[in-house]
């Protein structure tokens, strides 16, 4: 049986824990209970089959793998946000492409360099 897929919400939760410095602080920022934040991160680690955080005193610290995956998850969340923005713009009737009109007298070589 295939393992359940990790959700964007789980990545956002991990980011909040790291950015806020702990589970309680992340829960406050996310407007969720601390137990739901802890569960989301524990489930994420379980689904990935590796620890992303280790507890050092009262602070959650990223493991090496956690650090690598957190960086990539930030890109993923940013791309997902951009995709949602694009969908919203398309729904509003915005063009999905840019049209460039250039006078025939403009040197083609310059145009090609500028667009490269």
Spell out what each predicted region is.
Residues 7-10, 34, 66, 73:
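The N-cap/first-turn positions of alpha helices
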Residues 10-17, 69:
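Short alpha-helical "packing" element that flanks the helix-turn-helix/winged-helix DNA-binding module
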Residues 17-31:
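Short helix-boundary/capping micro-motifs
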Residues 28, 46, 67:
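Alpha-helical residues within the helix-turn-helix
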Residues 33-36, 40-43, 114:
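Residues within the DNA-recognition helix of helix-turn-helix
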Residues 45-64:
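A short LG(V/I)-centered, amphipathic sequence patch enriched
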Residues 47-48, 69-91:
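Alpha-helical linker/hinge and terminal dimerization helices associated
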Residues 88-108:
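Interdomain hinge and pocket-entrance segments immediately C-terminal to HTH DNA-binding domains
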